[in-house]
Amino acid sequence: MPLVSMKEMLIDAKENGYAVGQYNLNNLEFTQAILEASQEENAPVILGVSEGAARYMSGFYTVVKMVEGLMHDLNITIPVAIHLDHGSSFEKCKEAIDAGFTSVMIDASHSPFEENVEITSKVVEYAHDRGVSVEAELGTVGGQEDDVVADGVIYADPKECQELVEKTGIDTLAPALGSVHGPYKGEPKLGFKEMEEIGASTGLPLVLHGGTGIPTKDIQKAIPYGTAKINVNTENQIASAKAVREVLNNDKDVYDPRKYLGPAREAIKETVKGKIREFGTSNRAK
């Protein structure tokens, strides 16, 4: 099955009360694990790729070809979108689209509102002409992801969210509502009131960044308010690192990378399967 945009899968998720996971790629093993877990659960999936991860893997084109090769060799038949996470500029979004990405996020949330609208509109025009879906962000998601650092959380303004959607024609919106990138210090406090208002006023599928560490009860509360995409990366990274440490600590003579990267891949796969079930994505592939 060819790569698809995430527009249709998120519309279906919003209409049918579940969420699609975006699981970030960091290397070959992450990609194998996420694709295999999703295929086994018969779940649509979004492969997130940050600019930093793309650089680590040599570039957007390499990432796309790796994903396409794995989909062929692993006989992947579920819908798969490949999505630029936190695109920093129009130029980066264009570069990803030209390399074969089927979805992009333009993160101009640090810019003044009118500038955010202007940049996002430019990305939407280029992307939609090529059948590529677009996500935008308002407010500030705290924590750190690659080169994107935010000291605190700035909640999205519901009126600005509605205006951004109307002026740009984006497909999905990531309003900052209390989640953070990376591990949480204490329990997250999500703005459900704002989430409900934004979901109702925009009519769009909403995105929850920083999905690691958010309690299941909060996930289940967020989905009926319009949250249709939940991003996960840190949890998979922690599971992977733990598996590698375990192998190396138990056997000081191990040097073959397959002996420790294999268990890391299995740990990621099990983590992703757990998230798929938690988000209600199992058996939703169409």
From Swiss-Prot:
Pathway field: Carbohydrate degradation; glycolysis; D-glyceraldehyde 3-phosphate and glycerone phosphate from D-glucose: step 4/4
Cofactor binding note from Swiss-Prot or TrEMBL: Binds 2 Zn(2+) ions per subunit. One is catalytic and the other provides a structural contribution.
The keyword Zinc appears for this protein: yes
Species for this entry: Staphylococcus epidermidis (strain ATCC 35984 / DSM 28319 / BCRC 17069 / CCUG 31568 / BM 3577 / RP62A)
Keyword terms: Glycolysis, Lyase, Metal-binding, Zinc
Family, similarity comment: Belongs to the class II fructose-bisphosphate aldolase family.
Binding locations of Zn(2+) 2: D107, E137
InterPro entries recorded: Aldolase_TIM, Class_II_FBP_aldolase, FBA_II, Fruc_bis_ald_class-2
Cofactor(s) this protein cannot do without: Zn(2+)
Catalytic activity: beta-D-fructose 1,6-bisphosphate = D-glyceraldehyde 3-phosphate + dihydroxyacetone phosphate
Role summary: Catalyzes the aldol condensation of dihydroxyacetone phosphate (DHAP or glycerone-phosphate) with glyceraldehyde 3-phosphate (G3P) to form fructose 1,6-bisphosphate (FBP) in gluconeogenesis and the reverse reaction in glycolysis.
Catalytic residues, chain numbering: D85
Chain sites annotated for binding dihydroxyacetone phosphate: G182, G210, G211, T212, N231, V232, N233, T234
Single annotated GO MF: zinc ion binding
Gene: fba
Protein's name according to its UniProt entry: Fructose-bisphosphate aldolase
Positions with a binding annotation for D-glyceraldehyde 3-phosphate: S50
PANTHER family in the cross-refs: D-TAGATOSE-1,6-BISPHOSPHATE ALDOLASE (PTHR30304), D-TAGATOSE-1,6-BISPHOSPHATE ALDOLASE SUBUNIT GATY-RELATED (PTHR30304:SF0)
Residues that bind Zn(2+) 1: H86, H181, H209
One BP term from GO: fructose 1,6-bisphosphate metabolic process
EC number: 4.1.2.13
